[in-house]
Amino acid sequence: MDQIRPAAVRKIPCVLMRGGTSRGPYFLERDLPADPAARDRVLLAATGSPHSLQVDGIGGGHALTSKVAIVAPASRPGADVDYLFAQVSVDRAFVDWSPNCGNMLSGVA
């Protein structure tokens, strides 16, 4: 009988936090791959996308619970932190970097 081997698992620290009406993982930028395609793959895996229920990740199967915040030390004077928001598609292997989310941002404060 063939033994099924799980995909490689990589530990990446994060905090699962609610910000306003949204919730999701908050990652430190330094803990994620610098390469955008690799970073997208990590976020898709972390949320369990693409799967309508996101059963293999920490996404909640809905756009409100498939959001990611990435935080880094400020890269410019006058700012406390750098914040990057990602909307992870629930049922497609797609990470949208164009929107913003004030709810997730409130969790950074």
Where do the PLM segments sit?
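A glycine-rich beta-to-alpha transition motif near the start of alpha/beta enzyme domains, typified by
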Residues: 1-109
